[in-house]
Amino acid sequence: MTLTRITLACILVAMTTCGAAAQTSWPQFRGLHGGVAANNPVLPDTWGPDENIVWRVDVPGRGWSSPIVSGNHVFLTSVVNTTGVETPIKPLSQYQSRSFDGPMTGADLETPSAPLRWVLYDVDFETGAVRWARTLHTATPGAKHEKNSYASETPATDGERVYVYLGYVGLFAFDLDGTQLWHTPMDAREMRQGWGTASSPVVHGDRLYLVNDSLEQSFAAAYDTATGSEVWRIDRAEASNWSTPFIWENNVRTEVVTTGSGGVRSYDLDGRYLWGFEGMSSIHVATPFTRHGLLYINSGYTADSNRPVYAIRSGAAGDISLPIGSTSNDYVVWSNPTLGSYNPSALVYGDYHYTLLDRGILICHDAKTGAEVYPRQRVSRGGTLFTASPWAYNGKIFAISEDGDTYVMKAGPEFELLGTNALNEWTLATPAIANGSLIVRTVSNLYRISEE
């Protein structure tokens, strides 16, 4: 396969002045089906720097937002140092060893010494050429955790517009030709130990939904996709939160499900509280998703003893918290108090629920009952960490480590490691899957990978 290599750097100067059918979109973080893509014979099983790479794009700056896809458009964000010199990245092994020794703290902060430029890119899906790039904001922000980025929120699209949320700046909307349609400013808010932000927006109908939980004033809100005007807003008692909300279309109604340090809260599309429960870990990153008519929620901060997974039935009302010692009730179909993962969201593929722990452990349970199918299995060797969420297609489970190695496993009731695909680059972003291709973001490149 021919590799096309393109650089985005050449356009930075110009920017400063301004299921069965083919799956053609991946419109938000983890797509619409919790990381599961429709089977396609050209979706890749194996790849490497010179194998099955359709194109590779150099991405200036830093950003851990995931790419999204709409037809022939691939969107992603980055933050570029205006000096042209990026802050050196510490060796990945340093972060990994510290993560194993204990959670990182507020001492692990970096503060920019020069203004940064927040950038939205539109990359041509077929060729990898940069269709356009827009500078959204230029400023010198406050400190953040060294391992996070100032562009960690994944954009969202409805096929007509692309929406970008920047936790330090606000909401933006562009049409697919790169014209800015609106901007709704938001003030930066203090996050736990200065770790920065990551919760992404989601689109449903003519509204954009957002959760902004911080140490100051937390809230959930809906915005008009055409104008950016606020439709409703609800103040929340949650502390800092990095989880993306989920639109749950079930057999009873459509809900906006939010998770956080205080618990789970679900609202109707007009912001009215529906149901909730306590019992989450103190820091929450993973995003809810649905499969088999159930809502799956996992929460697993590594320093907490409570690291639960829940499977929720539709139709709940009010407080559905579990009594101490109980694992189910009328609406909690099953739960497990120690199964949750910290950074990666869980995956349900076929009849099985897969938990990928940050330390490279995969655990499989029956998705409908919670019964263990197989216990902890070591995916990786050598202590590498996993931040990106797993994904699945063609009867296989994929998990990409922070080292850029993707581990390919057979889906089903028995664990089998089929192979490893190395890109040899630091990787924290969850890939997108569309048009028979895997779109992978690393610390400095964007890849389109396919066996076409």
Located regions from the model:
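Positively charged n-region of N-terminal signal peptides that target proteins for export
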Residues: 1-6
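Bacterial N-terminal signal peptides
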Residues: 7-17
